[in-house]
Each structure stands twice: as structure tokens, then as C-alpha cells.
Amino acid sequence: MSAIENIVISMENATERRKHITKQFESKKLSFSFFNAYTYQSINQSINQSINQSINQSINQSINQSINQSNSILHNIEESRILTKGEKGCLISHFLLWNKCVNENFEYLKIFEDDVILGENAEVFLNQNEWLKTRFDFNDIFIIRLETFLQPVKLEKQTKIPPFNSRNFDILKSTHWGTAGYIISQGAAKYVIEYLKNIPSDEIVAVDELIFNKLVDVDNYIVYQLNPAICIQELQANQSKSVLTSGLEKERQKRSKIRKKKTLKQRLTRIKENIIRALNRKKWKEQQRIKEMQGKEIVRFM
């Protein structure tokens, strides 16, 4: 079965974000549906809530079936001590849609988050399906990443899949954060669900770390990076001028401040780095930038 229209994950009460999404998609004459994001509570309350939070009745039926089949995954995610509450809710929201893709036999799903900004000619990619069907087998395990996080990443050029609308399908070979926009094949949805079924709760990671980092080097699992990208998170595009607050980002920043106790070697290395920075801050910054960029590039947004 062909996929449904573009799905945007959004909390039901996120008024400003929903206005933002409506403006973005309507400006491109794109149809879309909101998927009410999973709100972290106790697992039993959340399951009952999730059944009622959906795009339409058919999706409710799919979610009900998915939950009945996947309680172990939901409980594992809830028990994770690594993830913040926001990260748990985000992962489960994406997971429920992957389950929908499999249970309703969709060839693929186009999934977005409610802080996405769409670029030039995004409608050509998101309104049409022929370019997808002529280039990809949806039984294969692949994700097409439509987004850039504007971070240095390793990309492998390939010639098997031709460009479309002057954008290449490069193969992602390193971490690339964010899940604001991607297309997942049914084959990939099955693979990621099966992966989650077979790992303990202490190995569960955030959704972007899972599909765009942890699995990137796995054989037969391919992430195609659309290059240049057709979408970006509003926070990444506008930085300090961002108007859409992110509770998830605040949680992550708070967690990053909780530092682990360092070894003597690590402390001495840090002291050395501080001295170098103090003596020649500009030179040190340039060295760090060059080191980070070796063999990498920043995927442009346009």
C-alpha cells in the first residue's frame, strides 16, 4: 500500500508550533496530518491516552494493535535511566508511527516534527511519489534523511541512485542529530522495531541517536542523506533568534551539565587544553575546527 500524506508529530496543546507547521505546509500547498505526540506518564495511563491520540480512526486502530503487540518495548523505554522524559515520549511517538507503517502495510512513511522549516522545492519531494518509487525498493532497509542539523558529517557519494531535482542521495557514515524530517521504508520500520525488541532498557537511546548514529554502520541498514537538505529545525536555522521553545532541548542541556567524575589523566589533559586555549585561543579554535571537519562536510539547507 502506498503511504499516506505527510505526518507531523506534535503535542496536542502546542498551539504556536501547530500554527508554525500549518503556515509551513500550506505555503508549499502540501497536505499533512498531525499525530498527537505521546506524553510521558505512567505506562498504563499513556497507553490508554495513545489509543485516543491519533490522526483519524484508522490510525487509532493501528495504534491499538501496535500497543498490544509491543508492550515490552514501551515498558523498556519507560524503564530507561538514560533518557529524559521528553526523549522517552519522542521515541515512543516515532515508534508508534513505525508500527503503523508495518501493521497497515504502508510502503513508507514521511515523518516530521513540529519545529521543521521547509526549504526550496520541498513540495516537489513531498507531493510526488514517482521519484521515490523509481529509485527505491521499500522492502529494503533504508531511511531518507530530509533534514540537516548543520553539523560536520561523513558522507559517501554513490552513483546507483540518481539525483532528483538537483539534490543527491549521499550515504550517511557518521552521526547526524535531529529527526525533524525523514522518510522511512517499511523494511527499515520492521528492522528498527525488531532491534528495539531485542535490547535491554539500559541500551535504549534517543530516537535520533538510534536511527542516525547507532545503526548507521550496521550492514544493510542505509541512511540516504538528501544533499542539499529540504528541511531544518527552526532552532538550528534561527539559533539565538529561535521563537519555538524546545522542552526536549532544555532537558538535554540540563543533563549535559551533570558531569561524570574524571580520571587523573582526563583532568591533566583538560588542564593542558585550558593552557593552550589561554595562550592562543584563536589558533586553538581553528585547530579544533580543522580536526572536526577532517573528512566531513556540512549538509546545506536550501
UniProtKB/Swiss-Prot annotation:
Keyword Glycosyltransferase: yes
Residue span of region 7 X 4 AA tandem repeats of S-I-N-Q: 42-69
Annotated consequence of substituting K29N: In strain: DL42 and RM 7004
Keyword Cytoplasm recorded: no
Gene Ontology MF annotations: glycosyltransferase activity
EC id: 2.-.-.-
Keyword field: Glycosyltransferase, Repeat, Transferase, Virulence
Record InterPro entries: Glyco_trans_25 (IPR002654)
Sequence repeats: 42-45, 46-49, 50-53, 54-57, 58-61, 62-65, 66-69
Function in brief: Involved in extracellular lipooligosaccharide (LOS) biosynthesis and virulence expression. Involved in the synthesis of the oligosaccharide moiety of the LOS molecule by adding GalNAc.
Domain notes: Between 2 and 7 copies of the SINQ repeats are to be found in different strains; these are thought to serve to generate phase-variable expression of this gene. The (SINQ)n peptide may form a random coiled structure that permits appropriate interactions between the N- and C-terminal domains of the protein.
Entry similarity comment: Belongs to the glycosyltransferase 25 family.
Protein name per Swiss-Prot or TrEMBL: Lipooligosaccharide biosynthesis protein lex-1
High-level lineage: Bacteria, Pseudomonadati, Pseudomonadota, Gammaproteobacteria, Pasteurellales
GN (gene name): lex1
